[in-house]
Amino acid sequence: MLSPLELAHRSLAEVIMARDLVVDATMGQGYDTVFLAELKADVVAFDVQALALDMTEKRLKQAQLSAKLILDGHENVGQYLEQPIKAAIFNLGYLPKSDKQVITQAETTLSALRQLLEMLVKGGRIALMIYYGHVGGLEERDTVLAFVSKLPQNVFQVMRYGGINQANQPPFLVMIEKRL
């Protein structure tokens, strides 16, 4: 059985072609950035922590891959991208093994998501891995779910995938695909 993150990767890989512009909105340890770069996509990755950039840069170098790494919040994505995107991925929560006070926030996540939905091409997808077992996580989860549940169904298809018999607030995936 696929984990939510494995399903996110598989769903994105179905639509991403070489040279497509894609976004890692929360680069963290760099795993998603490397995954996207392995697909030969043009990757732009964001994080507010220098540690995340350092870890991602090392992973990319080890894999002999490249991506544009930006030390800035994903809410500023519009300042860096002007062309359409094929896909994006978010891992909401905090950077493991770092300061748990530095977390993604509902307001900035919604701002980034709104901008990326506008930039998303027909058939493009956005994956949101929602980790909410930390202070502030429930608010962000509820805010994101309220927003995506109201996206017009003729324009976007929104799906939720996650375990239902797991303890300790298991993470889940929200996938969005643009229909029009």
Residue ranges of model-derived segments:
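S-adenosyl-L-methionine
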Residues: 1-21, 31, 54-82
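Conserved SAM-binding loop of SAM-dependent methyltransferases across substrates and taxa
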Residues: 29-41
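Conserved SAM-binding motif I beta-strand of class I
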Residues: 42-47
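Conserved SAM/SAH-binding beta-strand->alpha-helix loop
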Residues: 49-51
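Mobile active-site "lid"/loop adjacent to the S-adenosyl-L-methionine
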Residues: 89, 93-111
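Conserved beta-strand signature within the Rossmann-like core of class I S-adenosyl-L-methionine
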Residues: 119, 123-130
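Class I S-adenosyl-L-methionine
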Residues: 137-180
